[in-house]
Amino acid sequence: MRSSRITLVLGGAVAVLAFAAGIALGAGNGLKRLNLPGAANRPFSHVVVDGGTIYVAGTLGLDAETGKPPADAKAEARLALDDIRRKLELAGATMDDLVWVQVFCPDLELYDEFNAVYRTYFEAGFPARSFVGSGPLLFGSRFEINAIAVGG
């Protein structure tokens, strides 16, 4: 019985210390939240930098004038990847700094079309990547991309 109380107390102490460390790391730790110029006031950042790790999420390939995806899937993939590139440049990184990419697509038949464009964006090898079948995406998009880069 005494052994389980000691274990419980030690476990609780470890949990409190871990929680306190998390708060200390999260409060004023130098997170940078970056947005492309002219971005609408939306409830998210285009890029978040934490130390040497760069996070980009929810990137769509929308036409700047219409706010909609172009008719051609490859053109949409190009717009989305160009947008990822611009966002990485905000943080001083390049496409070759990417270590992880996640692509959501409601039509898995577009896998080869996406890859034909995607492969042209890298010189130093490819990041780890998943291509995930999804439900409908915002604005009728065919692709939504999340990415993590290291370095820059």
Which sequence ranges carry the predicted segments?
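N-terminal presequence-like segments and the immediate start of the first folded domain
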Residues: S4-D82, R86-V99, F104-G152
